[in-house]
Every structure is written in C-alpha cells, then in structure tokens.
Amino acid sequence: MPSNLEDRLRCVAAADGRYHINAYRFVYEALDYTVKQLEKKRHISGRELLEGIKNLALEQFGALAVMVFGVWGIHKTADFGNIVFNLVEAQMMSRSEEDNREDFDDVYEFRDVFRIDSKPRSMRSPR
C-alpha cells in the first residue's frame, strides 16, 4: 500500500468501488473534526462519528448534503459504516472491540437532518 494518505485513500476507494474517493476524504476529515470537538482526545463511537459527519456536512454543504452524498454513492448512514470499516481493514482507522459496522445502521435519515432549516449543533441557538 502507498505511504501517503491520498494514495492510500485512492487504493481503498478503488478496491471497494462503491463510493467516490471524496467520500473517503470526507470521512477522514469528519473524524478529525469530531475528535477536535472533544474536550479530551479519545476513541469515538460510530454514532459520535455520524454526529460529526452530520455537523460537518451541514457546515460545508447545507441542504445540498443529500445531493453531494448521493453523487459520492452514499445514501444512508450504513454507507458511512462501510467506508469506516474499509478504512479500518486498511489500517487507516482504528476500532475498539465494541465497534461494529451495525453501529452505523439507520442512525438518521438524510432527508430529516439535511433540511434547509438545519444547522450544525454548535451553530444552533440555545433553547
């Protein structure tokens, strides 16, 4: 496997074939984004990563996130689980014993969380 990140991501994306390279880049970026939101660096769960993915997508794409993800081959939260576990298998991400691909199944519906009036959690006004 190549040594630089971009080439490694390309290899993983090509080996699987279901998702665009940009989906892999975005998941990697979302992991970094999510970890930076923590007070103390630690392992994050699949659900925590999905929350970070949602917030980053709202920041970057807003209501167009569903369309962007669709172009990349992502149609449900389980697709992010497939990408994460492809990266785990390539030793580009780590997992704990408790982590499972199923942690990503049906966590939220894209059409519900990526609406025009949706904002990342950090940008919402307090209730």
Which residue ranges define each predicted feature?
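Non-transmembrane, aqueous-exposed alpha-helical and coiled segments at domain scale
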Residues: 1-127
